[in-house]
Amino acid sequence: MKTWQDCVAFHGHECGGLTIGYKASLYAIELLNLEFSADEQVVCIAENDACGVDGIQVMLGCSIGKGNLLFHMRGKQAFSFYNRKTGTSVRLVLKPKPEGMTREESFAYYQSCEPKDMFDVKDATIQLPEKARLFDSYVCDCCGETTGANWIR
């Protein structure tokens, strides 16, 4: 299994946001019996594009290029995880932290928390997307650039 240090190496620095994604991944692994996703077995739909997403990429193997990391932007620290193998899913929503903390205090707080104490566990409300599809490419009549068929009108 990947480690916190793997997440830091990928992201470039330690921070509270990275910790959120790392701990969300650990909790999803526990709740859904997940393993690192070599292909599209694990799907994550993130409701933000903040630092925590990097932790999820490292820990679970979700990526935009593979089509198993998607964004449903709502500005929330919430992540829906899906196990295609078992058909199970969960939505983890970050609980509010104590008010008035500095960045350093927030980081220390999140580092000290158990994942179960950080997140509310809810049903995933976004339908599991279909597996990524490959599209033919065509030269666009307007610009002359090669474009995926799904974008040509």
Residue ranges and their predicted role:
Residues 149-150:
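Short, non-ligating residues that shape and space the ligands of small metal-coordination modules
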Residues 134-136:
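Short metal-coordination and nucleic-acid-contact micro-motifs, chiefly zinc-binding Cys/His arrays
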